[in-house]
């Protein structure tokens, strides 16, 4: 989510900013003042600001679970006045927002559906820069990792209370960690001496648990474990699974949803959902689609798009991004009224 390079007063330029706008441009411009865009991972507001400047007639709904990010984004986007509304929620709270929140922009979305939506997944650079949040493994900090600091368990809670099997499963599933079992054993042994509270102790454990040969070639030894803990703390995959049908249901005909994934498990979920949604339900072998079985969506991107070499050179955090976009082409269920 919002992995950035530097940009003037606000510090960051969103990854693939121009391409994200281009993917939704045609339909948003065609709808004019009836166009509602959803930035479901508002972060510092970089993408949202660019969209509002690029599409001067459009309105935008911004979602973020992080109250600090939402506060800063609201201040940044205040010049756009009533064209922007920000709501604190996980992005899989989208349906509830569209059904329950009051406001002119929400009413417009209920009446006309969503013209374009962006999901920039993962942790933001703004969160990484806030040492006390515990997302970064290169600086000693509390093992927190909550995107909404008022809710849920922390990374320390997981390390201090989860079973060996659950810790190993999390590290393997969410971090692709080859040494998940060995790390889990080391965690259980260490927490008997003293509960985990800060990141430096965990990083030291990981250096000891992961073989030297792997440390030399596999990147920072803490990267995969910290990623896995963050995903578990914030229920990131469940949120993604939940929101995929929510946003596609909310799109109007011609509306597009764009997902930026930085981890393989995220991209696999998006890819499978898009494939299922764009495949005819007609039994194989029939020459035409039976009534009611034709797909109501098409994939806009051919496979997953990636950042250009020039962008990666300017902003190395763009290197892993995979972009997929889908468009509603029929059966307008975007009308939520």
Swiss-Prot record:
Give the coiled coil ranges.
none
Q: Which reaction does it catalyse?
A: cytidine(1402) in 16S rRNA + S-adenosyl-L-methionine = N(4)-methylcytidine(1402) in 16S rRNA + S-adenosyl-L-homocysteine + H(+)
Q: Name one Pfam family in it.
A: Methyltransf_5
Q: Which GO terms describe its molecular function?
A: rRNA (cytosine-N4-)-methyltransferase activity
One of this protein's GO BP terms?
rRNA base methylation
Q: Which InterPro entries does this entry report, sorted A to Z?
A: RsmH (IPR002903), SAM-dep_MeTrfase_MraW_recog (IPR023397), SAM-dependent_MTases_sf (IPR029063)
Q: Which UniProt keywords apply?
A: Cytoplasm, Methyltransferase, rRNA processing, S-adenosyl-L-methionine, Transferase
Task: Give the matching SUPFAM superfamilies.
Answer: Putative methyltransferase TM0872, insert domain, S-adenosyl-L-methionine-dependent methyltransferases
Enzyme Commission number(s) of this protein = 2.1.1.199
Spell out the subcellular localization from the entry: Cytoplasm
A GO cellular component annotation in the UniProt record? cytoplasm
Question: Where the protein is mainly located, per its record?
Answer: cytoplasm
Residues annotated as binding S-adenosyl-L-methionine: 45-47, 64, 91, 120, 127
* Chain's role: Specifically methylates the N4 position of cytidine in position 1402 (C1402) of 16S rRNA.
Similarity section: Belongs to the methyltransferase superfamily. RsmH family.
Tell me the protein's name. Ribosomal RNA small subunit methyltransferase H
**Species per Swiss-Prot/TrEMBL record:** Corynebacterium glutamicum (strain ATCC 13032 / DSM 20300 / JCM 1318 / BCRC 11384 / CCUG 27702 / LMG 3730 / NBRC 12168 / NCIMB 10025 / NRRL B-2784 / 534)
Task: Identify the taxonomic lineage of the organism of origin.
Answer: Bacteria, Bacillati, Actinomycetota, Actinomycetes, Mycobacteriales
């Amino acid at each position: 989510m919002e992995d950035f390079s530097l940009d003037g007063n606000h510090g960051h330029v969103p990854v693939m900013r121009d391409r994200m706008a281009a993917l939704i441009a045609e339909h948003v411009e065609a709808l004019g003042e009836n166009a509602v865009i959803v930035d479901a991972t508002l972060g510092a507001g970089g993408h949202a600001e660019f969209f509002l400047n690029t599409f001067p007639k459009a309105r935008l709904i911004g979602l973020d679970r992080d109250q600090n990010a939402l506060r800063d984004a609201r201040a940044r986007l205040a010049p756009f006045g009533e064209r922007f509304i920000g709501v604190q929620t996980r992005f899989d709270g989208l349906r509830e927002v569209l059904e329950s929140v009051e406001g002119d922009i929400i009413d417009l979305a209920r009446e006309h559906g969503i013209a374009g939506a962006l999901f920039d997944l993962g942790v933001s650079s703004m969160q990484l820069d806030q040492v006390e949040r515990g997302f970064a493994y290169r600086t000693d900090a509390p093992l927190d990792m909550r995107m909404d600091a008022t809710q849920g368990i922390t990374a320390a809670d997981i390390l201090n209370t989860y079973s060996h099997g659950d810790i190993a499963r999390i590290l393997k599933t969410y971090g692709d960690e080859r040494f998940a079992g060995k790390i889990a054993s080391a965690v259980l042994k260490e927490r008997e001496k003293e509960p985990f509270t800060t990141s430096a102790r965990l990083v030291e454990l990981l250096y000891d648990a992961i073989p030297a040969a792997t440390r030399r070639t596999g990147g920072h030894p803490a990267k995969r474990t910290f990623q896995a803990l963050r995903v578990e703390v914030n229920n990131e995959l469940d949120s993604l699974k939940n929101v995929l049908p929510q946003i596609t249901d909310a799109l109007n005909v011609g509306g597009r949803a764009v997902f930026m994934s930085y981890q393989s498990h995220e991209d696999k979920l998006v890819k499978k959902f898009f494939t299922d949604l764009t495949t005819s339900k007609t039994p194989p072998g029939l020459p035409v689609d039976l009534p009611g079985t034709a797909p109501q969506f098409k994939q806009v991107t051919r496979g997953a798009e990636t950042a250009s070499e020039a962008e990666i050179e300017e902003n190395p955090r763009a290197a892993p991004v995979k972009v997929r976009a889908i468009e509603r082409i029929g059966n307008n269920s975007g009308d939520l009224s």
